[in-house]
């Protein structure tokens, strides 16, 4: 079991709140059709839905990440997203340590076949590792969308912890100044 699968997720949610404080709702909702059909808000809502669904499914031992809500205030308003991130962080902090090794059944729609749903066995701590990776990768997309609007995301926003470690280990290397000095 990971020593602390909750802490890194809470840290990511706190990074998100700090980032959202720097955006207007117009920037948050902006869709750059040259790049994607999703806004920063769409990616943030997607990430926060995953945390919400994990926390909602934990007591029953069933998590369905596809039961997401779309076109909500979380997708359209920075303040609503920041509030949802705070609720998710609070929910994660409240997860008892005894529940981390708890078995879960995880559901999702399989492939691109309507009506096909797959499920597998997992554990709460494993799903928290998934959520951390999933969040970092969506934050990387958010960082790209922000840069396309001329915004500068925080230095480590959307950068995997292993990448940060690698870059920092290259003391004096130009690459460390490139990725981590931004923001």
Where are these predicted regions, by residue range?
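Short, extreme N-terminal leader segments that mark the start of a protein/domain
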Residues: 1-5, 9
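A generic secondary-structure signal for well-formed alpha-helical elements
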Residues: 20, 51, 146-149
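Short, helix-capping/interhelical loops that line the mouth of catalytic, cofactor-
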Residues: 49-94, 98-116, 151-183
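Individual transmembrane alpha-helices with interfacial aromatic-anchor signatures
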Residues: 120-133
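Short conserved catalytic/interaction loops centered on acidic-Pro-aromatic/His motifs
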Residues: 139-157
């Amino acid at each position: 079991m990971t020593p602390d699968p909750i802490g890194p997720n809470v840290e990511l949610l706190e990074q998100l709140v700090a980032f959202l404080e720097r955006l207007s709702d117009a920037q948050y909702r902006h869709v750059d059709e040259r790049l994607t059909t999703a806004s920063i808000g769409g990616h943030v809502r997607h990430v926060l839905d995953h945390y919400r669904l994990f926390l909602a499914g934990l007591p029953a031992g069933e998590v369905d990440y596809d039961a997401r809500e779309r076109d909500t205030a979380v997708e359209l308003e920075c303040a609503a997203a920041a509030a949802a991130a705070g609720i998710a962080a609070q929910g994660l902090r409240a997860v008892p340590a005894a529940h981390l090794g708890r078995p879960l059944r995880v559901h999702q729609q399989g492939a691109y076949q309507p009506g096909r749903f797959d499920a597998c066995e997992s554990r709460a701590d494993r799903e928290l590792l998934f959520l951390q990776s999933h969040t970092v990768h969506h934050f990387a997309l958010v960082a790209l969308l922000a840069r396309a609007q001329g915004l500068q995301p925080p230095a480590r926003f959307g950068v995997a912890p292993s990448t940060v470690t690698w870059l920092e280990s290259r003391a004096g290397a130009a690459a460390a100044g490139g990725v981590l000095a931004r923001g």
